Amino acid sequence: MELNKLKLTELVPLISKGEVRPHEIIIDVFKRVQEVEGKVKAYITLTVEKAYDMAREAENAIFSGKKSLLTGIPIAVKDNICTKGILTTCASKILYNFYPPYESTVTSKLLNNKYILIGKTNMDEFAMGSSTENSGFHVTKNPWDLERVPGGSSGGSAAAVAADECIAALGSDTGGSIRQPASFCGVVGLKPTYGRVSRFGLVAFASSLDQIGPITKCVADAALLMNVISGHDPMDSTSAPIESSDFTEYLGKEVKGIKIGIPKEYFIEGMDKEVEERIKDAIKELESLGCIPVEISLPHTEYAVATYYIIATSEASSNLARYDGVKYGLRVQGKDLLEMYMKTRSRGFGTEVKRRIMLGTYSLSAGYYEAYYKKAQQVRTLIKNDFEKAFEKVDFIVTPTAPSPAFKIGEKIDDPLQMYLSDIFTISVNLAGVPAISLPCGFSEKGLPVGLQIIGKPFDEAGILQLAYAYEQSTPWHKMKPLL
């Protein structure tokens, strides 16, 4: 048995019964990493020695009767989530030597469970991108087709899960950065409600949009990981005062009579025909399970991309002002303080990060604040209202995750607008702060995965997981693996 190929929900009972030891699992995981990492390049940092130490700690906990839910489970963590004493770069040269002096809340919760950290995964620099081509270190490849992108910005996490280089992973989602890579790599990605999972220790991109979530091999694994990472955190002022619940309780429950909204604005010209066909097939499958499709309208969808790129870049220009070479990270010497700031930021940040800082600074400038930033916030409210009105009629909203399957490496990197439009179906969810999941719903003729997005009401992750699980169990797509 190749233990690295098992799901989280398969390994947990095996560890509990003593049939499998954590040490054995990580041997298989690192064997797989050795086989395929040279092709996939999912990781920035592999924590091999640390992983074996953690495996010993996990085994000691098991033998002393102190096993927790995720004890002995190898998990990969996106490289913008702080791990104390372990290199955390955000895939940026400006943080090439940053070892956080503290632990993020989500990894603290995993540590309390005695998990095993496999490594820190590659990403678009500071989570700005949709392809993982903007990494300051290397480009991650899609395990289904090594000439294509894995999506972004959590491309390393999604690729690692798809390639069985870990059992599960954590990502972050600001405008689709968990869901779009999950769609491209044929895995499951959940973006929780804003405030459901603590952001303490997540390196900020856009503070009103960022959210940490799981990337897993199946829906039940996502539910299990959510049990551990969700819940109120006093260290995060935006954390919702809602404690974690058992999300696995809802798996397998009846979905008959559930109303699913189909927004007409999400079936647009320019969308890949095969994606449209797979989504329509998925809607028929949900109908056969007893769900009731209802056509709805989210009328301000057409403004979502513009709204997002004003708000997100404005917040980024403020958040990234702290990287100046003084306290940590890259420092390039200059003849005075101002020159040091300029040289450090010029050499440390990549092209896309510089572009977004400039755009955000422009939007916040005195002459344009009213015309851009303030107006974008007003449109954001309209988008949020669209969802509230829709959820008066339906229980969930079903859409494509992305307008196309994974595109070729280099295909969109020189065309920012085309790259930005690849998040057109995911961005509104972040602007509204609602939860959404992406799960596999078929393949293109070229064998590339297609993702189905299910959007729920605020804090109804349990309902999303219930519906996603029902669909997943009635289809074979989650069982498909890339041939690497």
UniProtKB/Swiss-Prot annotation:
Keyword Endoplasmic reticulum: no
Domain of life, source organism: Bacteria
InterPro entries, per the entry: Amidase, Amidase_CS, Amidase_dom, AS_sf, GatA
Pfam families, per the entry: Amidase
GO cellular component: glutamyl-tRNA(Gln) amidotransferase complex
Bilayer-spanning residue ranges: none
Active-site annotation: 78 (charge relay system), 153 (charge relay system), 177 (acyl-ester intermediate)
EC number(s) recorded for this UniProt protein: 6.3.5.7
Gene3D superfamilies tied to this protein: Amidase signature (AS) domain (3.90.1300.10)
SUPFAM superfamilies: Amidase signature (AS) enzymes
Molecular function via GO: ATP binding; glutaminyl-tRNA synthase (glutamine-hydrolyzing) activity
Keywords annotated in UniProt: ATP-binding, Ligase, Nucleotide-binding, Protein biosynthesis
Catalytic activity: L-glutamyl-tRNA(Gln) + L-glutamine + ATP + H2O = L-glutaminyl-tRNA(Gln) + L-glutamate + ADP + phosphate + H(+)
Family classification: Belongs to the amidase family. GatA subfamily.
Subunit structure: Heterotrimer of A, B and C subunits.
Free-text function comment from the UniProt entry: Allows the formation of correctly charged Gln-tRNA(Gln) through the transamidation of misacylated Glu-tRNA(Gln) in organisms which lack glutaminyl-tRNA synthetase. The reaction takes place in the presence of glutamine and ATP through an activated gamma-phospho-Glu-tRNA(Gln).
HAMAP family: GatA
Protein name: Glutamyl-tRNA(Gln) amidotransferase subunit A
